[in-house]
Amino acid sequence: MYFILFIAFLISQRLSELYIASRNEKWLRSQGAVEYGKEHYPYIVALHTLFILSIIVEYIGRGQTDIDLIFLLLFALLLLFKFWALSSLGKYWNTKIFRVPGTGPVKKGPYKLFKHPNYFIVICEIAIIPLVFHLYYTAIIFTVLNAIMLMVRIKVENKVWAE
């Protein structure tokens, strides 16, 4: 039962993020924003979709497992940090890479301290979420795949902001 509630929450959270990103995209485009990294974006969507499916499949394959409260607490802390990061970006936050001409990177909230705090959060989420239910294969495989994907994405984003 806890697993179903957790997955429902996770999916709802991700869909909410996509809704916010879609709304922000409309605003960004109205400001003349240019999108970058279109080539790799479908792979990011696929990675995150397969991540959730892998959690479900591995959980079913393992049978019911106990919840690791330490990892659940870490996930809750990540959500707070994510809220801070996303709210600091405001309408500039998106799951895609956009740049409004004449603007620089946002430098408030955690972005004063780190160059890519949201990517740090995503790295931790991909590793920690499966560990809430002791799903080690999903944690390892998707942490590696996500690291590869983020190397591509961060390279593109850094190039965009260097222009």
Give the residues covered by each predicted segment.
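Alpha-helical architecture
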Residues: 12-15, 46, 76, 114
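Membrane-helix exit/interface motif
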Residues: 20, 48-63
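Cytosolic-biased juxtamembrane loops and peripheral soluble domains of multi-pass membrane proteins
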Residues: 21-40, 66-163
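Interfacial helix-start motif at the membrane-water boundary
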Residues: 38-51
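Membrane-embedded alpha-helical segments that form the functional core of polytopic membrane enzymes
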Residues: 4-9, 73-77
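N-terminal signal-anchor/start-transfer transmembrane helix
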Residues: 9-21
